[in-house]
């Protein structure tokens, strides 16, 4: 089977590549990858090349396919797997394999990654339960289950303690104060959505950022009135220019501090602020992955000793987290489409990956069977004045107030003749 992929060839070197895949073995799957949402972790891998923990050597001869937030359709089933999978079945990939090597889809494999028209899912990923049946029909939601899975996993990884009781209570503190720092970006939107609609029921959620435009957008998507209707106080704060942001934020809790803090940017000042905002037994989750292996910040160990403050770091999520993300999206409790601001085809991947931090907006969603430059949804109407494809896409997203939706996805895929398979039974 001939495939077209976006692959890492070295540091800051991402290219389109077209080649014949080998025949699958009896314990592998050949799949068509319909959609992949671009992760900042992919940019980090492309930036570092083989210096990245998960990226192997010899990229020049064996380039690795980018992308891991993906979903698609099974095309061919190895004969030892016919009792579990069938041709035409939709799937979503759980890329967190948990291997000692750190290897996983989108970083480490020549034939296994989300930015591909076709890929081979290897035996090891199948044995680890990474291929989940997808019962829905909206591939964007399936792709976005992976970033939502990471967000959900972070909430589950936080923990709290009782003095002299040597068991951790996992999860955020019920009825507690949550601070989401540097959290008005694409992943932050998902974090706010889950805090309000995921059923964890904090009493207060404070969202902190320094970008008025991003804060205004997320407030439209997730307004304070929605949170209030669920018994949650939601506060949006721009700390840019504040003389004492720590005092201002602590005052929102009556100077008690925050029970659970999630840091969404690997910026020393943000981590230090998080430390100062912790309540007694407060848990700081360092969600943002740094590119610097020597990333260090001061931390108050007086509070560690006397106030039981503590730190966790999370990367990825479990299969159960993925299943929760899919289920909550299917019922409409979570709206992962809120995160999406740009749509593109496979041809857009190299430039998108290499310039991701400089492209404004939220998640960039790629449809591998589509040829289309990366385009902001907000620009569809203007482009539609001269292009009938964008004219219809603009009409379809207007029905959901500018949010990407299943009807727009189906129309786009149909224009390029993409086979979308059938829902898992």
Language model regions located:
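Glycine-rich beta-strand-centered segment in the early N-terminal region that forms part
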Residues: 22-37, 51-100, 113, 132
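Adenosine-nucleotide cofactor-binding segment
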Residues: 175-176, 181, 192-270, 393
């Amino acid at each position: 089977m001939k495939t077209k992929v976006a692959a890492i060839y070295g540091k800051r070197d991402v290219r389109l590549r077209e080649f014949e895949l080998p025949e699958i073995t009896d314990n592998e799957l050949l799949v068509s990858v319909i959609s992949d949402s671009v992760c900042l972790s992919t940019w980090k891998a492309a930036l570092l090349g083989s210096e990245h923990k998960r990226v192997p050597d010899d990229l020049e001869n064996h380039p690795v396919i980018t992308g891991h937030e993906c979903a698609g359709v099974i095309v061919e089933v190895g004969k030892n797997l016919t009792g579990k999978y069938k041709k035409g079945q939709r799937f979503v990939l759980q890329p967190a394999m948990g291997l000692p090597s750190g290897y996983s889809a989108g970083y480490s494999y020549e034939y296994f990654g989300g930015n591909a028209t076709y890929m081979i899912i290897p035996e090891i990923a199948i044995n680890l339960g990474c291929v989940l049946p997808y019962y829905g029909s909206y591939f964007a939601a399936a792709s976005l289950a992976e970033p939502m899975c990471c967000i959900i996993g972070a909430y589950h990884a936080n923990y709290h303690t009782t003095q002299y009781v040597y068991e951790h209570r996992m999860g955020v503190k019920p009825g507690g104060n949550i601070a989401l720092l540097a959290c008005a970006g694409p992943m932050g939107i998902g974090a706010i959505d889950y805090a309000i609609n995921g059923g964890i029921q904090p009493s207060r959620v404070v969202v902190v950022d320094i970008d008025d435009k991003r804060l205004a957008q997320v407030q439209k998507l997730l307004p304070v009135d929605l949170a209030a209707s669920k018994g949650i106080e939601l506060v949006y704060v721009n700390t840019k220019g504040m003389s004492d942001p720590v005092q201002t934020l602590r005052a929102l809790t009556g100077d008690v501090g925050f029970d659970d803090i999630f840091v969404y940017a690997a910026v020393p000042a943000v981590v230090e602020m998080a430390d100062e905002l912790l309540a007694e037994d407060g848990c700081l989750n360092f969600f943002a992955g740094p590119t610097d292996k020597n990333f260090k910040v001061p931390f108050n160990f007086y509070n560690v000793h006397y106030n039981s403050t503590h730190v966790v770091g999370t990367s990825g999520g479990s299969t159960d987290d993925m299943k929760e993300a899919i289920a909550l999206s299917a019922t409409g409790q979570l709206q992962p489409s809120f995160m999406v601001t740009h749509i593109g085809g496979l041809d857009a991947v190299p430039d998108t990956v290499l310039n991701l931090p400089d492209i404004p907006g939220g998640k960039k969603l790629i449809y591998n069977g589509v040829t289309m430059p990366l385009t902001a949804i907000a620009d569809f109407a203007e482009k539609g004045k001269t292009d009938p494809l964008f004219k219809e896409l603009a009409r379809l997203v207007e029905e959901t107030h500018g949010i990407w939706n299943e009807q727009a996805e189906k129309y786009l895929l149909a224009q390029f003749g993409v086979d979308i398979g059938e829902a898992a039974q």
